[in-house]
From Swiss-Prot:
The record marks Y138, K183 as: Important for catalysis. Catalyzes the oxidation of 3-carboxy-2-hydroxy-4-methylpentanoate (3-isopropylmalate) to 3-carboxy-4-methyl-2-oxopentanoate. The product decarboxylates to 4-methyl-2 oxopentanoate. This is 3-isopropylmalate dehydrogenase. It is an enzyme of class 1 (oxidoreductase). PROSITE patterns: IDH_IMDH. One of its GO terms (cellular component) is cytosol. Substrate binds at R93, R103, R131, D215. It catalyses: (2R,3S)-3-isopropylmalate + NAD(+) = 4-methyl-2-oxopentanoate + CO2 + NADH. Its main location: cytoplasm. Its cofactor is Mg(2+); Mn(2+). It comes from Streptococcus mutans serotype c (strain ATCC 700610 / UA159). Its EC number is 1.1.1.85.
């Protein structure tokens, strides 16, 4: 039996978590997948329960889980507080050594009109951004004085090698192309990044490697996003480019993500926030959460059939014109969830 720890969090988190688990249970019955759920407080809910966004019992449960589902964190009441929900996310990434953030970017045909790009620009877009999550300038030394400031960007060969291998492994199961993004013409870290990328490429002779400078890649992501298959880059560049890629579908409501460690549990979550303005109204779009469940089935448990079942059901539901308000429709959370289950 697989143990899944759920972190419903704040805002619309509990509502979309319930939707995700409802779909998960329906699929689990169809594929005979045996599991148990352990729900834990996290984010603002963790602060309310224990004074910390990542309570000790939540962390202990997460460390022994086979996978972790996170819905959403954040609440206006903590915006100016010394202890904030977002600190829990940074803490759990560090404690579980979640070094690889995986963000799929796919355009659903039924939602093409929502994209800010012309139809011909987004046709065929289906790529994955692989972002190194625990190294680089965010985790370097930061110095600030009255007249100067300094941030240290540091990467080791081993840190680069493991994220590269993750990207190449993902590409091997897709269209076998990796685009490594750096700033090799200026930065020493990028020179090492490119060197290690070339070394790892030799281990995956069936996968094509290309390099792009980050400024060029940012431009191509708008002018020709369909050219990408797997994009891999360091923490700062990945933070920016993954957010850029998230606007291509025209909505955050259909985008899941995963964060992987080397040997421990992975964490799956929507990329959108807690949307406190609509919390409790029953109108939140659950698709990002539901697709995060699909990612969990595929990546953590090897249940490709179950993952595809969910993805096909979501696509069919959207094609039928069943849309939540953020997508231009009238369906509420429960109606969208029920429609997806009916289409499994």
């Amino acid at each position: 039996m697989k143990k899944i720890v759920t972190l419903a969090g704040d805002g619309i988190g509990p509502e979309i978590m319930a939707a995700g688990l409802e779909v998960f249970d329906a699929v689990a019955q169809k594929i005979n997948f045996d599991y148990e759920i352990e729900a834990k407080a996290f984010g603002g809910a963790g602060i309310d329960a224990s004074g910390h966004p990542l309570p000790d019992d939540t962390l202990a449960a997460a460390k022994t889980a086979d996978a972790i589902l996170l819905a959403a964190i954040g609440s206006p009441q903590y915006d100016k507080a010394p202890v904030r929900p977002e600190q829990g996310l940074l803490a759990i990434r560090k404690e579980l050594n979640l070094f690889a953030n995986i963000r799929p970017v796919r355009i659903f045909d039924a939602l093409r009109h929502l994209s800010p790009l012309k139809a011909e620009r987004i046709a065929g877009v289906d790529f994955v951004v692989v972002r190194e999550l625990t190294g680089g300038i965010y985790f370097g030394q930061h110095t600030l004085t009255e007249n100067s400031a300094c941030d240290i960007n540091e990467y080791s060969a081993s840190e680069i090698r493991r994220i590269m291998r993750k990207a190449f492994a993902i590409a091997r199961g897709r269209s076998k192309k990796v685009t490594s993004i750096d700033k090799q013409n200026v930065l020493a870290t990028s020179k090492l990044w490119r060197q290690i990328a070339e070394e790892v490429a030799k281990e995956y002779s069936d996968v094509t490697l290309e390099h792009q400078l980050v400024d060029s890649a940012a431009m191509v992501m708008i002018t020709n996003p369909a050219c990408f298959d797997v994009v891999v880059t360091e923490n700062l560049f990945g933070d920016i480019l993954s957010d850029e890629s998230s606007v291509l579908p025209g909505t955050l409501g259909v985008m899941p993500s995963a964060s992987h460690s080397e040997s421990g549990p992975s964490l799956y979550e929507p990329i959108h926030g807690s949307a406190p303005d609509i919390a409790g109204k029953g109108i939140a779009n659950p698709i990002s959460m539901i697709l995060s469940v699909a990612m969990m089935l595929r990546d953590s448990f090897g249940e490709t059939a179950g993952a595809e079942m969910i993805e096909h059901a979501v696509n069919k539901t959207l094609t039928q014109g069943i849309l939540t308000r953020d997508l231009g429709g009238l369906a509420n959370t429960k109606q969208m969830t029920a429609a997806i289950i009916a289409n499994l």
